[in-house]
Amino acid sequence: MNNVHFNEINILKALAIMLVVSGHLEFSLLGMFTPYSFQLALFFFISGYLFKDKYLTNIAEFMDKRIKSLLVPYFWYNLFYLCVTLIIAKLTGKLWGMPITFKNFFITPFLNGHQFDLSCPLWFVTQLFMTMTVFLFLMRTLKKCKDNKIFHLIFFTIIGCLAIPLSKLTAVTPFTLVVIRTMMSLFFVYLGYFYAHYIKDNYNIFTPKWAGAMISLQAILWLFNRDFDPVHGIGLSYVLVWARFDQQLIVPIFTSITGIWASLFVVKLLYPYLKDIKFLQDMGNVTYHIMANHLLVMYIITAILLKINGIPMSERLNHNIYWIYDPVQTTYLYFVLTMVITTYIGILQKKAKQKLLDPIFAKK
């Protein structure tokens, strides 16, 4: 991957994490392409985009890299948020999470990832690990059976499209929840892989005609919006973590595709103006840490605003983990502060790791 493609994908990652944070603050960065209609599909797409074919013949290297890059930091964060949750419980009398048990610390992360409310966005990390592992073995099998990109695309499309009907035909247990999430996310991983290998350098899908078609399709999709009184999202939303698709069967697939296209289009359009902004490049490099820490930062901002306005912290206990103080006035302040603070937290963490831990492991 050359520097231009690397920087483009880094800015795309920065946009993706901003969409996650803006979604949790209930506003849309991309207008009619609302975050809860595609934000995590975009991250799965990026993972497929970055997948290297060399792993198809080197499973050990793939597993070693994924465990070190995804699961090891995940459980360090799990330990950190265990401590934070216990401290907050001691100070406020509210336990933001599930009971502290061996199962909830080690097993629940692979089921729903909501053992601690403040770190619940990290459910995506363990799901990504499972999805990419399944993707690796499926790709190995498919290439042996029939090494044809259209056949592979049809296969993964069928898998993805069957996920939503399955959620309506079966009881959503911890096991079926993982199956449904994996099925749907596999489609977007392969879509990213397909785009990187067969579309990006061969077809221009960002022409005015493409833009008109995608905007028209999105306008039609809004006719199917059921999110009139949103608890999650701000239109056309679905909640993949809980396999909640409401009354929809296929619309979430289409809104994910249009949202991914819109994100790619925005990055292509603005790349000449954004490529030299170091903060955006840094943000794209620390999306894991932003995902992990943004709810904690919002919680702290809320505590400060409550204190400034003379409101007891007990008011915070009456709401869920996503609640913020006076959202009409403060939403964008939360967004800017959260993105800045979590980005620099991530930068500091990466520098500390490089200085303190990398030399130790390099000697082994």
Each predicted region: which residue ranges?
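Alpha-helical transmembrane segments and their immediate juxtamembrane cytosolic regions
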Residues: 1-364
